[in-house]
Regions:
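Structural beta-strand segments of beta-rich domains
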Residues: 59-61, 204-208, 365-367
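Extracytoplasmic copper-binding redox domains, predominantly the cupredoxin/blue-copper superfamily
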Residues: 34-35, 64, 68-98, 162, ...
Length: 475
């Protein structure tokens, strides 16, 4: 089986001078994950993963999401909220958990596309994020820089790799088993919706945009033949220079851009992409295999070396880190823990249901945030909306890795670890979320709000979902 993609890269309804317009229906569909057995999925445009949106840097997009999902097996309405993960969106378009779209409603989201990176869109509806995403509500969204260095692989050699895992019953039904509101681990690894696929690759360099869209599972990626992975980008764009690593840890919500060069392999060579077990994740023999690359064809005439400096803007992360540290106005600490009496996951002992704010930096303020794993035997991938951050330190067994030293919005916090990050807050004022991206933890209720500045647009009332019917004008 070969890697396949849900749709072509450009499927917008129409364009104008600076905006691309899309319409996506959230609806039930079916997929053949087990041979000859149909599995019900909930997908954007009825597909898993959803349509790949490929945007040019600097062109705004408007995406109309229509909720046609109806009810679940317990006759509960399947409400949604869409978050474009990695976008500096205005509060009303950021996927605030309580800004829900019910079945029969739609909402138009406006995205700025002002940074070139591998993003993804997924459900963020309050207390339904995990099950909605597990059923399939996730898709890739790439913002490309037309002026990027030409020696970085492009076109057919620029490949999104959407990772997820599923547990299926014998009849093909997706089994959501959250271990007492702790985690969901499947025994089937999917790449772009396909279980353990094979991909034919030419004898040249490929850029793989890895995106972990799972619920709880992290991966420690490696090539079966021992060849190093060359990391060129993090969550929020290119690193300054390529970084080689033998293993690459990728938690839920994280993205890494990796170059693999197949030039020195003869046609017929097979190379497996594997994963080491992650501490405290439920592992199966089947989850140690991800996919296989099958080398085909003769030598490729044009296979230039990767540039030593990846970014055309000359951005210096070390200088930026020092500049931010010289402007720090305050430090904050956030302890991610577990209230076993209430069966809730907490941030500083509070939950989403408690309301209020966990922080209120002003627009332009530079702060250091310390994330503390409160223990209990779990790792937490911590996601902060709106801003890109730079990691400063991680204690315990696994120190900061060189491939993590770019702009990021998700930080993998190992069991018992503390992480320090620094960021300048903005560009928008308003309320945003931070949470654990183990989506079971998020739903039960490890998520808190912070507000940048004062007086920003309300994330719920400014642009609420509206009824969708035949009288709604098209985009």
């Amino acid at each position: 089986m070969r890697v396949t993609f849900a749709t072509s890269r450009r499927f917008y309804q129409f364009v104008d001078s600076n905006t691309d317009y899309y319409e996506i229906r959230m609806q039930k569909g079916s997929a053949e994950i087990l041979p000859n057995i149909q599995t019900e999925i909930w997908g954007y445009s009825g597909m898993v993963p959803g349509p790949l949106i490929y945007q040019q840097l600097g062109r705004q997009s408007v995406v109309r999401f229509i909720n046609n999902l109806g009810t679940d097996s317990q006759n509960r309405k399947i409400h949604t909220s869409v978050h474009l993960h990695g976008s500096a969106s205005l509060p009303q378009y950021d996927g605030w958990a309580d800004d829900i779209t019910n079945p029969g409603q739609y909402k138009d989201y406006i995205f700025p596309n002002n940074r070139a990176a591998t993003l993804w869109y997924h459900d963020h509806g309050v207390h339904r994020t995990a099950v909605n995403a597990y059923m399939g509500l996730a898709g890739n969204y790439i913002v490309a820089d037309p002026n990027e260095n030409p020696n970085i692989p492009k076109g057919e050699f620029d490949v999104p790799v959407v990772l997820s895992d599923k547990l299926l019953a014998r009849n093909g039904r997706i089994v959501y088993a959250d271990s007492g509101e702790k985690d969901v681990f499947g025994d089937i690894v999917l790449v772009n919706g396909v279980p353990w696929p094979r991909m034919a690759v030419k004898r040249t360099k490929y850029r793989f945009r890895f995106c972990n869209t799972g619920i709880s599972r992290a991966y420690i990626l490696k090539l079966g033949n021992g060849q190093p992975l060359t990391v060129i980008g993090t969550d929020a764009g290119l690193l300054p220079s390529p970084v080689q690593t033998n293993i690459l840890t990728i938690g839920v919500g994280e993205r890494y851009e990796v170059v693999i060069d197949f030039a020195n392999y003869s046609a017929g060579t097979q190379i497996e992409l594997l994963s080491n077990d992650v501490l405290n994740d439920t592992a199966f023999a089947s989850t140690r295999k991800i996919m296989r690359f099958d080398v085909v064809g003769g030598a490729v005439s044009y296979n230039p070396p990767l540039p030593s400096f990846l970014r055309n803007d000359g951005f210096d992360f070390n200088r930026k880190r020092q500049e931010l540290l010289s402007r720090v106005v305050r430090r904050r600490e956030f302890v991610f823990g577990r209230d076993n009496l209430q069966s809730q996951w907490t941030v500083n002992g509070r939950t989403w249901a408690n309301g209020g704010l966990e922080a209120n930096p002003q627009v332009g303020d530079v702060e250091i945030w310390k994330f503390v794993n409160g223990g209990g035997g779990w790792h937490h991938p911590i996601h902060v909306h709106l801003v890109d951050m730079l990691i400063l330190s991680r204690n315990k067994r696994r120190r900061v890795q060189p491939y993590e030293l770019g702009w990021k919005d998700v930080f993998f916090m190992d069991e018992g670890a503390d992480i320090e990050v620094v960021a300048q807050f903005g560009p928008h004022s308003g309320k945003y979320m931070m949470h654990c991206h183990n989506l079971v933890h998020e739903d039960h209720d490890m998520m808190r709000a912070f507000e940048v500045g004062q007086g920003g647009p309300d994330p719920v009332t400014t642009a609420p979902a509206k009824p969708y019917n035949s009288s709604v004008p098209p985009l």
